[in-house]
């Protein structure tokens, strides 16, 4: 892949998501959905973003749900404007552990996500519990000159 090549993120994510449940090896059936369009990015930024989204989904599958849960849902929501790509990875699981801090987490996966979002994508990352249960991980990535602002049809 050349640096100038563009990648349709929706196609890539849609191909990866069905595989993730099989790899997770959890007893709880998890439904994974994508809402909205991630669109097209240059290859370097697309690679970093795909790594971030897959790590966040995998983290939700492995940690969000009680072993006794009958089912769970992880949803990737994307909203794209001319300047920003906003992505929320939402789960309807048990929420965050007491005292959890994204900035202080020593989990390797979250450290990698934090580094990719802030250093590679020049974006921001946040994580919070959802009233009624679950967690939202929110990332905002600027769409620079090299990022296509178009959303494929």
Protein language model annotation of sequence segments:
Residues 30, 83-87, 135:
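Short beta-strand element(s) in the Bergerat
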Residues 3-23:
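Short beta-to-alpha transition helix within the HATPase_c
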